[in-house]
Curated annotation (Swiss-Prot):
NAD(+) binds at G13, S19, I20, Q40, D66, V67, V94, K166, I195, R196, T197, L198, A199. It is an enzyme of class 1 (oxidoreductase). Keywords: Fatty acid biosynthesis, Fatty acid metabolism, Lipid biosynthesis, Lipid metabolism, NAD, Oxidoreductase. Belongs to the short-chain dehydrogenases/reductases (SDR) family. FabI subfamily. GO terms for molecular function: enoyl-[acyl-carrier-protein] reductase (NADH) activity; identical protein binding. Catalyzes the reduction of a carbon-carbon double bond in an enoyl moiety that is covalently linked to an acyl carrier protein (ACP). Involved in the elongation cycle of fatty acid which are used in the lipid metabolism. The active site is at Y149 (proton acceptor), Y159 (proton acceptor). CDD domains: ENR_SDR. It catalyses: a 2,3-saturated acyl-[ACP] + NAD(+) = a (2E)-enoyl-[ACP] + NADH + H(+). Its EC number is 1.3.1.9. This is Enoyl-[acyl-carrier-protein] reductase [NADH] FabI. It comes from the Bacteria.
Length: 265
C-alpha cells in the first residue's frame, strides 16, 4: 500500500510526458492516490485524457481550465464536487511569460504587460486555486503544492520577469500556509533544478543553462522529473505532516554552491 492511498489529488498543468507535473502524477499514482486533471484548452484535451488513463484516472475527471479565468477555476471545483466529496491535494504546475520577456537584458525587455501576465499566470493562479478549492479541502489535513526555481532568489540569464513571478509565488506559499494552516491544509513548493520541459524551451539559451548546471551542481548531473515527482509526492503525503510554508530544493545541491568545480578538477 502506497503512502498516498486514499488521497485524492487535482493536478493542474500537465502538458506533456516530459513535464514536471507528469513526474508528480506518476509518483502519486504509484503511491496510491486517485487523480484528477485539468487541461488548458481543447487542443490539449485528448493528450491529457490519454495521460490520465495511464495514471488510473478517467476522462470525466479531466476538466478544462484556463487559470487566467476565475470562472473556469471555480467551474473545475464545482464539477469535481460531483465526483468527489472532498479533496486532499492540489498540485499547481503552471508558469508563463511572453517569449519576448525571456530573451535579452532584463531592464530592456521587461514591459508592464509582460510583468502583469507573468505574475497573473505564474503566481496569482496558485492563490486562485487555493481559494476555489478551500471548502473541498477543509479539515482533511491536505496539501497544496507548487513548483518554483532558484531564479526566484538569484539572477539567471534570460529568466528575467519569471524570476520575479517565482519570487511572488514563493511569498504566496508562505502567506497561504499561514492562512490555511488552522484548517489543516499545508502549503509547500518544490524548487527544481532545470529540466528540459515545454515551458523551459521558451527560455533563450536553455541548453547552455542545463550544461552549466550539470558542471556546477555537487552531484555533477541534472535532476529528473521522476526525482522531482518523488519529492512532490512526499510533500503531499502524511509523511510530511509537519512541513508547511517551505521551499524544498530538488536541484542536486546547486542552490548550496557559490562556485562550481574549476577546469582542472
Amino acid at each position: 500500500m502506497g503512502f498516498l492511498t486514499g488521497k485524492r489529488a487535482l493536478i493542474v498543468g500537465v502538458a506533456s510526458k516530459l513535464s514536471i507535473a507528469s513526474g508528480i502524477a506518476a509518483a502519486m499514482h504509484r503511491e496510491g492516490a486517485e487523480l484528477a486533471f485539468t487541461y488548458q484548452n481543447d487542443k490539449l484535451r485528448g493528450r491529457v485524457e490519454e495521460f490520465a488513463s495511464g495514471w488510473g484516472s478517467r476522462p470525466e475527471l479531466c476538466f478544462p481550465c484556463d487559470v487566467a479565468d476565475d470562472s473556469q477555476i471555480e467551474a473545475v471545483f464545482a464539477a469535481l464536487g460531483k465526483h468527489w466529496d472532498g479533496l486532499d491535494i492540489i498540485v499547481h504546475s503552471v508558469g508563463f511569460a511572453p517569449g519576448d520577456q525571456l530573451d535579452g537584458d532584463f531592464t530592456a525587455v521587461t514591459t508592464r504587460e509582460g510583468f502583469r501576465i507573468a505574475h497573473d499566470i505564474s503566481a496569482y493562479s496558485f492563490i486562485a486555486l487555493a481559494k476555489a478549492g478551500r471548502e473541498m479541502m477543509k479539515g482533511r489535513n491536505g496539501s497544496l503544492l507548487t513548483l518554483s526555481y532558484l531564479g526566484a532568489e538569484r539572477t539567471m540569464p534570460n529568466y528575467n520577469v519569471m524570476g520575479m513571478a517565482k519570487a511572488s509565488l514563493e511569498a504566496g506559499v508562505r502567506y497561504l500556509a499561514g492562512s490555511l494552516g488552522a484548517e489543516g491544509t499545508r502549503v509547500n513548493a518544490v524548487s527544481a533544478g532545470p529540466i528540459r520541459t515545454l515551458a523551459a524551451s521558451g527560455i533563450k539559451s536553455f541548453r547552455k543553462m542545463l550544461a552549466a548546471n550539470e558542471r556546477q551542481t555537487p552531484l555533477r548531473r541534472n535532476v529528473t522529473i521522476e526525482e522531482v515527482g518523488n519529492a512532490g509526492a512526499f510533500l503531499c503525503s502524511d509523511l510530511a505532516s509537519g512541513i508547511s510554508g517551505e521551499i524544498l530544493y530538488v536541484d542536486g545541491g546547486f542552490n548550496t554552491t557559490a562556485m562550481g568545480p574549476l577546469d582542472d578538477d
